[in-house]
Regions:
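Glutamine-centric residue-chemistry signal
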Residues: 43, 132, 158-161, 328
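Auxiliary Fe-S-binding modules of radical SAM enzymes
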Residues: 1-106, 110-115, 266-275, 282-372
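Conserved AdoMet/S-adenosylmethionine-binding subsite of the radical SAM
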Residues: 164-343
Length: 372
């Protein structure tokens, strides 16, 4: 077992391990096994993650001995993710559709600034990244689960999204939100491994406090995250301030109702000494009433949380819609009048079908139609 994460068991796993799934200490262990000097591990990490390099094959690691490169190629895979489509937006938000090595499709979204996360304008470039292929949690308003759940992403596939977007755009990502396809905390071990690579000085070097995980409400995993050493931020996809409303649109609420979820949140805030964010998608005639706003204010005040209001991004084939701008503003005003720090997300991506999973679903259906 390595400090801060589970070690890869090289003897049990038959398939090749991707080189970008390894922590530096694991690389150092393999380097020793190959009877190479310890500094070779750092050289490999530099080739993988440093901006000027970021090679895509072992052959490109030109300062490593040829025989050593051959051994690495025999021992490890070097997977790539391919960009299938990029959709731009008039507000410069861009959505990326990736094809993985096994043919599965996933999405990421590049957001040039994320005021709703910080409460003010920001020059940061944020990537909204995926953690699973599809989703098993079946939120009624979300496109990610419409085609079901396929598998968890490996650590390297999570990290690769960030590097692929940086490579394509030439822009440095300095903020990551795991709010794309999938339930991040249902892929806990792979995600923690990926975050350690993203956070490490030898990796992508992005500070833990610039990394936010979102969860639909897996109470045990929230408590597990609270006991992790990583100081990442946590956002709760709440979307309903009562069990009645939340249960209509989020099946997870039947397993972990608000009492269980909020108890886990309370444990998290006491352990981490961090402020939570409640993500709240405003859906017309479902969860946008003044009563829901008042009840949400009570919950947020109790936990010292801030609220990020998100007007619903419509999904083809689903009946939901966003409230009027006036209703959105009224909901926000009730929260603020109740003493809750709250923001209403500015329009970013509505014109590029930026709802989670929508581009993947449209592309898959188009391919199925073309081949049927």
């Amino acid at each position: 077992m390595l400090a801060g994460g589970k070690a890869v068991n090289f003897n049990v796993i038959a398939a090749k391990i991707d080189i970008k799934s390894l922590q530096l200490a694991e690389l150092e262990g393999k380097v020793r096994e190959f009877r190479e000097p310890k500094y070779r591990a750092r050289q490999i990490a530099d080739w993988l993650y440093q901006n000027q390099k970021r090679v895509r094959s072992f052959d490109e690691m030109t300062d490593l001995p040829g025989e050593f490169r051959n051994r690495l190629a025999q021992e490890f895979s070097f997977s790539k993710i391919d960009i299938v489509r990029v959709l731009g937006s008039r507000d410069t938000t861009r959505k990326f559709l990736f094809r993985l090595a096994d043919g599965n499709l996933i999405e990421s979204v590049l957001i040039p600034a994320s005021p709703a996360l910080y409460g003010s304008r920001s020059d940061r470039r944020t990537i909204c990244a995926s953690t699973q292929v599809g989703c098993a949690y079946g939120c009624k308003f979300c496109a990610s689960g419409l085609d079901g759940f396929s598998r968890n992403l490996a650590a390297n596939e999570i990290v690769d999204q960030i590097m692929a977007v940086e490579r394509e755009t030439g822009e440095k990502i300095d903020n990551i939100v795991f709010m794309g396809m999938g339930e991040p905390l249902a892929n806990f071990d792979n995600l923690m491994r990926a975050i350690r690579i993203i956070n490490a000085p030898w990796g992508l070097g992005i500070g833990a406090r610039h990394i936010t995980l979102s969860t639909s409400g897996l109470a045990p995993q929230i408590q597990k995250l609270a006991d992790e050493s990583l100081q990442v931020r946590l956002a709760i996809s709440l979307h309903g301030a009562t069990d009645e409303v939340r249960g209509q649109i989020m099946p997870i609420n039947r397993r972990y109702n608000l009492d269980k979820l909020l108890a886990a949140c309370d444990y998290y805030t006491k352990r981490k000494k961090q402020r939570l964010t409640f993500e709240y998608i405003l859906i017309a005639n479902v969860n946008d009433s003044p009563e829901q706003a008042r009840k949400l204010a009570v919950i947020a005040r109790r936990l010292g949380a801030k609220v990020n209001l998100i007007p619903y991004n419509t999904v083809q084939g689903l009946q939901w819609s966003r409230p009027s701008p006036e209703q959105q503003t009224q909901f926000l005003s009730i929260l603020r009048a109740g003493g809750v720090p709250a923001t209403l997300r500015r329009e970013k991506g509505h014109d590029i079908d930026a709802a989670c999973g929508q581009l993947r679903l449209q592309t898959k259906r188009a391919l199925e139609t073309a081949t049927s």
